[in-house]
């Protein structure tokens, strides 16, 4: 029981620490990079959304040109960090966390490794657990017993997501977004319409633990 309590306290501390950073320090970092790049940040309230595929959307009373500049800046400098801090402070279950974060990590890995030519949608897993649909060399490494730790992690995530997809589909995972509202030089996290829909039943969680 003592270990459980320590872990819970540590988890709460890390969540509070990240929440504090989001509220008090994130905007200063965004502003610093924007100034370096000569990008004007909006004076009015605006919003950043990052979906599980890594697509960034900027909303607010901003010109399309300015939206594109800010989107590119966020993509190049903050996207992964913003996703990580959001998902770690969001009010979601462990199962939801593992599913949506697994999808994000698989997508980012595949897109970066293939220069955006492939995505999770291209992946197939047969009854023997063999992964196909990606470039031949990548599939060979992914299916090898000698794959490095990163490839093993991606492979396990692919198995988990494929199992979930076969049981429930991916619509609920794809609807999840990391949302940030920026107003008066303050950043705060905001929920989006899809963030409460990821299935979280005991039966699936029990099965999930046996395949990862």
Give the predicted meaning of each segment.
Residues 1-212:
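Type III/flagellar secretion export determinants
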């Amino acid at each position: 029981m003592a270990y459980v309590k320590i872990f819970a306290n540590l988890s709460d501390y890390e969540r509070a620490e990240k929440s504090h950073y989001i509220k008090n320090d994130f905007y200063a970092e965004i502003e610093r990079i924007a100034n370096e790049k000569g990008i004007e940040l909006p004076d009015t309230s605006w919003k950043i959304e990052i979906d599980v595929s890594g697509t960034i959307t900027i909303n607010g009373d901003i010109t399309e040109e300015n939206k594109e500049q800010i989107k590119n800046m966020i993509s190049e400098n903050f996207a992964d960090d913003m996703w990580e801090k959001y998902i770690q402070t969001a009010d979601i279950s462990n199962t939801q966390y593992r599913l949506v974060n697994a999808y994000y990590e698989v997508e980012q890995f595949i897109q970066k490794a293939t220069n955006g030519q492939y995505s999770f949608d291209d992946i197939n897993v047969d009854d023997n657990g063999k992964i196909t649909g990606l470039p031949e060399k990548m599939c060979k490494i992914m299916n090898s017993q000698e794959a490095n730790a990163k490839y093993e992690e991606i492979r396990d995530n692919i198995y988990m997501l494929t199992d979930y997809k076969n049981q429930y589909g991916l619509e609920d995972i794809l609807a999840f977004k990391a949302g940030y509202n920026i107003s008066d030089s303050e950043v705060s996290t905001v929920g989006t319409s899809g963030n409460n829909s990821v299935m979280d039943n005991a039966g699936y969680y029990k099965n999930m633990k046996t395949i990862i």
